[in-house]
Amino acid sequence: DYCCRRPTCIPIC
């Protein structure tokens, strides 16, 4: 999964 789809990650999408 991409970082965008991970609840533990806060990416800039």
Curated annotation (Swiss-Prot):
Subcellular localization: Secreted
Disulfide bond annotation, renumbered to this chain: 3-9, 4-13
Domain of life: Eukaryota
Gene Ontology CC entries for this record: extracellular region; host cell postsynaptic membrane
Keyword entries, A-Z: Acetylcholine receptor inhibiting toxin, Amidation, Disulfide bond, Hydroxylation, Ion channel impairing toxin, Neurotoxin, Postsynaptic neurotoxin, Secreted, Toxin
MF GO annotations: acetylcholine receptor inhibitor activity; ion channel regulator activity; toxin activity
Modified residues (4-hydroxyproline): 7
Modification Cysteine amide, positions: 13
Expressing tissues: Expressed by the venom duct (at protein level).
Similarity comment: Belongs to the conotoxin A superfamily.
Protein task: Acts as an inhibitor of nicotinic acetylcholine receptors (nAChR). Specifically inhibits the alpha-7 nAChRs of D.melanogaster, and seems to have no inhibitory effect on vertebrate nAChR subtypes.
Record remark on domains: The cysteine framework is I (CC-C-C). Alpha4/3 pattern.
Protein name according to UniProt: Alpha-conotoxin BruIB
Biological source species: Conus brunneus (Wood's brown cone)
Lineage: Eukaryota, Metazoa, Spiralia, Lophotrochozoa, Mollusca
